Design a protein with these regions (language model features):
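Acidic/polar loop-and-plug regions of large Gram-negative outer-membrane beta-barrel proteins
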Residues: 192, 201-264, 289-292
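Transmembrane beta-barrel wall of Gram-negative outer-membrane proteins
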Residues: 134, 141-172, 177-216, 256, ...
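Non-catalytic regulatory/gating segments with a bias toward low-complexity or hydrophobic composition
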Residues: 40, 101-104, 122-124, 277
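Extracytoplasmic beta-strand/coil segments of soluble accessory domains associated
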Residues: 16, 37-78, 100
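Short acidic/polar hinge/loop motifs at secondary-structure boundaries
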Residues: 59, 78-106, 125
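Extracytoplasmic loops and strand-loop junctions of Gram-negative outer membrane beta-barrel proteins
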Residues: 84-85, 104-106, 133-136, 170-175, ...
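Short, acidic, small-residue-rich periplasmic hinge/interaction motif at the N-terminus
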Residues: 1-29, 67
Length: 292
């Protein structure tokens, strides 16, 4: 029910490129309360870290190249920042819930909608509209006050070919690093149309993650950690945080919501010719605070 004409997938023993794949089962198994890039840490050539420690502040390197030299795609659409090539994972917190697979292509590859990057290409595929009717509710708890609730529902494919999938989740936590609390919600919906015997397949998907979180600078010296730590070096110390009127306060606070909408149409004109059309758009609103 989901179209795939514009999604770049390397085929084993056919596509001449080093590639690794992560299944939906592995994503759910390794996800937990990790950052989404950390799921890829066991893949050869990949290095992911939480960086400052704030929710969504992680980064990933591929073949030693940072994210500005790595193409990152969601359902075939490039999501790197158009000005500097960076990717802010806090905008895509919900991928752990909705991703059905990840494929990492190391080195230059063939992509339809993104400029091939020297580091490689990370393709993330979201869940298709499920053909089976049903739903689920799950609750997750973790260290440092982390809590996450996920609810999903699939209408199942009707006799006329329509199907709908919806997922909502909410998370919050205090953060392992001092004064790095965060809270957010994730949303995803997909509507598919694929009648039996038809040569047309249509799919609309909409996903996003509204959030706010406190951050920690990464350029603080070891001397500062020694001076301000209670006993020796305090790895949880945060130069930006403290308390104000009895509540947590941070000079660096990030807040953003950047949904992505995609419409795909696949048309099998004949046995030798197929037309794949994709229309996508993304608009964000938010910002951040910090010392002058």
């Amino acid at each position: 029910v989901v179209t795939s004409g514009v999604i770049d997938i390397a085929v084993g023993r056919k596509t001449p490129i080093a590639v690794s794949s992560i299944s939906s089962k592995d994503i759910q198994l390794k996800g937990g309360n990790q950052e989404f890039p950390e799921i890829m840490n066991k893949v050869p050539g990949v290095y992911a870290t939480k960086q400052g420690g704030g929710y969504g502040d992680s980064r990933i390197s591929l073949r030693g190249f940072d994210q500005t030299n790595t193409s990152i795609l969601i359902n075939g659409q490039p999501v790197n920042d158009m000005e500097n090539g960076r990717l802010y994972w806090s905008n895509w917190q919900g991928l752990t819930d909705v991703a059905s697979g990840i494929q990492i292509q190391r080195g230059l590859g063939a992509t339809k909608l993104a400029v091939p990057s020297v580091g490689g290409t990370i393709s993330i595929f979201t869940k298709a509209v499920d053909k089976e009717k049903g739903g689920s509710i799950s609750q997750m708890v973790g260290n440092d006050g982390y809590s996450k609730t996920v609810a999903s529902y699939n209408s199942g494919k009707s006799e006329s070919g329509w199907a709908t999938s919806v997922l909502l989740s909410k998370w919050s936590g205090n953060g392992y690093i001092n004064n790095t609390s965060g809270e957010g919600f994730n949303y995803f919906t997909a509507i598919g149309y694929a009648p039996e015997g038809s040569k047309h397949e249509l799919n609309f998907s909409f996903l996003g993650a509204g959030q706010w979180h406190h951050q920690r600078d990464v350029w603080v010296s070891i001397r500062d950690y020694q001076n301000f730590g209670d006993e020796g070096i305090d790895t949880r110390w945060n130069s930006n945080g403290g308390s104000l009127n009895g509540e947590e306060f941070s000079m660096r606070r990030n807040f953003y919501n950047k949904p992505l909408a995609t419409f795909n149409w696949d048309w099998e004109i004949n046995s030798k010719l197929k037309l794949a059309t994709s229309l996508y758009g993304s608009a964000g609103r938010g910002g951040g605070t910090g010392p002058r």
